[in-house]
Amino acid sequence: MRWLVLLLLAFAMFCSYIFMDILSPIKDLMQSTRGWDSTAFGTMQGSETFLNVFVFFLIFAGIILDKMGVRFTAILSGAVMLVGATINWYAVTDAFQGSGLQTWFTNNLNYIPGFDELGISPFYRGMPASAKFAAIGFMIFGCGVEMAGITVSRGIVKWFKGREMALARLGVATCMIFSPVFAKLGGVIDVSRSVAFGVVLLLIALIMFIVYFFMDRKLDAQTGEAEEKDDPFKISDLGTILSSSGFWLVALLCVLYYSAIFPFQKYAVNMLQCNLVFNEVPSDSFWATNTVTVLQYCIMLVVAGASFASNFMKKAGMKYGLLTVAGVLLAVFCYMGYMRQSAETVFAVFPLLAVGITPILGNYVDHKGKAASMLMVGSMLLVLCHLTFAFVLPEFRDNAIGGIIVAYLTILVLGASFSLVPASLWPSVPKLVDAKIIGSAYALIFWVQNIGLWLFPLLIGKVLDKTNTQLVADLKNGVITPEEAAVSYDYTAPLVMLACLGIAALVLGFILKIVDKKKGLGLEEPNIKA
């Protein structure tokens, strides 16, 4: 039963992760078909967390979770995500272009009193109308997805207390593989098809939350317990949480690390397009067919499933057999990505190594501890990867095979570093606060994290435009086409900025380890109770 619950919650979050990055692999198409430059793209992407940060919606979400319970909040979050995604979809459709709504958005929301003075407005004068409307939808979606995040975290604590707490994510790979396919389906580019794909998945996610609602209620009926709700929220709860130095160190580690990962995902495909040369595959080639797309995705699922399952095999022969299958098919997956000559299929390898090692890391933290140490290792790998993208990968621009190999290896290591954080950070939160206010604790961590997830997509976009002034000028003057400009950015400065976040996270991890040892927070202790 508990694994079925994990499956329901994981699949719902899987769908939400897909929509979160649905436009990331088609940033170049958004610039060429909708006129979104890097600043507009980054501003729209950052809007996802705007209401969570500046209207404190995520704090309220934690209060709702504590007072109303997991079941109610899960369904509410699914509905909110679906509404926001639908608005986002309409904003990028052809129906929006030339409509009265487009005219209204063009003429309005160019100045937001207070927010403009503080430099935090989610809109600006000259921002494409479609980007403004999409930003509104993304804000609403962001409220839902972050509410879902803390709800799923709470649900896993309820069902898996003292057991494995890692949640595998393949949503990013699914998005990278299928989003461009839907956008280019039939040889006609229509970016709204990609978003529609995400909307359908969010409808499925809502259904998963509804099924979870009835399963969880059935569990309570069988055990004779009422749904677990926490004590009524009190302002003093926040004081209890905020007074913990360990909590603040974990929260800051979270914002630094995730700010160097999630915003990067939104630009990663375009970064590869700008640093490597991808030759267009002939339309009559086998590698250009949708059959290859589906086949590659199926191979990805087998790789993920085999590597994940190998962690639970007790017989050595079965364990290493599954690992061999996963390794061989991973090589096939990478070869197919190279033959397809598309940046999005190269970056799709991002979570595959993570899927295999996340159970290992989760099991290690559960039985051996060392969560703070694992956070430090993850930060070091993060710095190494971003510096490799910034300075090593561009040197292989004219080396087709060498560049792809460097890209694959770096992306796999980055994915592995990403798995270190969920496996070690989230299980540590219950050690820092009382179980009755854990919903508020998760909400506060997500709120701090959301500050970074709002700021850094916007910063990356602005830094790209500011450090590529000649490119921006040439595009404005018609010297180059939008299609050429979209794949010609120099990403060195943004990548160095992200590497600095990793360095700061490493320093904080070191401090956290010292504080843990001095105050006995138990972060280096096993999660499994003896």
Where are these regions (language model features)?
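Central cavity-lining transmembrane alpha-helices of secondary-active solute carriers
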Residues: G46-I63, L301, A348-L361
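C-terminal ends and interior cores of transmembrane alpha-helices
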Residues: A79-G126, V332-M336, M380-A400
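Cytoplasmic helix-loop-helix junction between adjacent transmembrane helices
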Residues: A131-T174
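Extracytoplasmic gate region of multi-pass secondary transporters
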Residues: L23-K27, S244-S310, V328-A354, T358, ...
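C-terminal transmembrane helical hairpin of 12-TM major facilitator-type secondary transporters
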Residues: L323-G337, S342, A348-L353, A371-L425
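Helix-to-loop junctions at the C-terminal end of transmembrane segments
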Residues: V55-V70, A306-K315, I357-K370
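Helix-loop-helix hairpin linking two adjacent transmembrane segments in secondary transporters
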Residues: G171-R217
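Flexible cytoplasmic inter-helical loops of multi-pass small-molecule transporters
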Residues: W104-F105, F213-D237, G520-I528
